[in-house]
Amino acid sequence: MLIDNMRMSVTDFLIANWFLSIPFLILIVLYVRAFAKRGGQRISVHEATSLINKGAQIIDVRDSNEFESGHITGAKNIPNNDIERRSNEIISEKPIILTCALGQNSPSAGEKLQEQGFKDIYILSGGLTTWAETGLPLVTD
């Protein structure tokens, strides 16, 4: 009986310790928001195609072998390791869509570009895997 009385649900704990819970929850929300914008705004395939139709540039940050195996039409290949050195090849006045295989390497490239003053940076959520899964074409030039 004593053990049952000592058990406290998570909800009961949060309510009983609201003065600790609220700041902790605020910190979690702020952390998640900051992480979500790291390197650029995440966009869907649909949003990416809309931006591409409006003249956005596509930068594929995979290595050249991966790029040659299939990429979005009009994409420029600047591997993540070279992005700082070759940033002069990117037009700062146009929106930039960064792509990679799964959407996991693009944010680091985006951070590097942000450090160099680029503003309009977007990350293709799910990368080229998601692009291909939606039935959109990849070319091999």
Feature-to-residue mapping (PLM):
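Rhodanese-like catalytic fold shared by cysteine-dependent sulfurtransferases
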Residues: L2-V45, L51-K54, S64-P95, Q104-D141
